[in-house]
Swiss-Prot record:
Uptake of Fe(2+) ions across the membrane. Part of a ferrous iron transporter composed of EfeU, EfeO and EfeB. Residues 50-77, 128-138, 199-203 are cytoplasmic. This is Ferrous iron permease EfeU.
Length: 235
């Protein structure tokens, strides 16, 4: 097991054992707070990746070469930098998966997490062995779009959790009912619920929060980088 997976597993076990002692309303409140934290972290990660994706490969290679050429002290600094980067990503994974698991959609989110971890391990070995060459710019672009839709679902789930906790009781009318078209009891509906927070009969507030988050996020993501940021990267 990799260090990242161990860190995520230990953190997940601790959080799961802690939240299991909460009363129902407090647990719903905690779920909503976790979902909000996950949305903030994922959104920050998307725009950070957008900022660095153009030159990330060259910058990483130059930083590694420079650190290794300066001697053992800088080599250990590089090791610690990688360690803390992995720890940060592991914590992000814990909050994301916890927010997904709290939606109580059965075995599919844990199964998806295991498959995702296995895929990451395989891709890591292929990249290390030089079996594939990854276009990091395109990879960050499409995964960032995917993450924005995931975050929108988490935002809608947060407002639902706050309603169940008794903190938000406005606009709770059913916006539409898609159960006849895509039920959450079907395989595909369950996958959509686990990944994107899909609800077959969402409330008006859930739909509103989904659009209020996603539309500005997509617009900001589609805008070209600021001239100042571009100039600083090219300098």
């Amino acid at each position: 097991m990799t260090s990242r997976s161990r860190q995520a597993a230990y953190s997940g076990i601790f959080i799961n054992e802690t939240t299991g002692e909460f009363p129902q309303k407090e647990q719903e409140l905690f779920e909503g707070i976790v979902a909000v934290i996950a949305v903030v972290i994922l959104t920050w990660m998307v725009f950070w990746m957008r900022k660095v994706s153009r030159n990330v490969k060259v910058q990483l290679e130059q930083a590694v070469d420079s650190a290794l050429q300066r001697g053992n002290h800088h080599g250990w600094a590089l090791v610690m930098m990688v360690f803390f980067a992995v720890a940060r990503e592991g914590l992000e994974s814990v909050f994301f998966l916890l927010a997904a698991f709290q939606q109580d959609v059965g075995i599919w989110p844990p199964l998806g997490a295991m498959l995702g971890l296995a895929t990451a391990v395989v891709l890591g070995f292929l990249l290390y062995w030089g079996g594939i060459r990854l276009n990091l710019g395109a990879f960050f672009k499409w995964t960032s779009l995917f993450i924005l839709f995931v975050a929108a679902g988490l935002a809608a789930g947060a407002i639902r959790a706050f309603h169940e906790a008794g903190l938000w009781n406005h606009f709770q009318e059913i916006a539409f009912d898609m159960s006849a078209v895509l039920s959450t009891h079907s395989l595909f509906g369950t996958l959509m619920e686990g990944i994107f927070g899909y609800q077959e009969a969402p409330s008006v507030s859930e739909v509103a929060v989904w659009f209020i988050y996603l539309i500005p996020a997509l617009v900001a993501f589609a805008l070209p980088p600021r001239a100042g940021a571009t100039a600083s990267r090219s300098a």
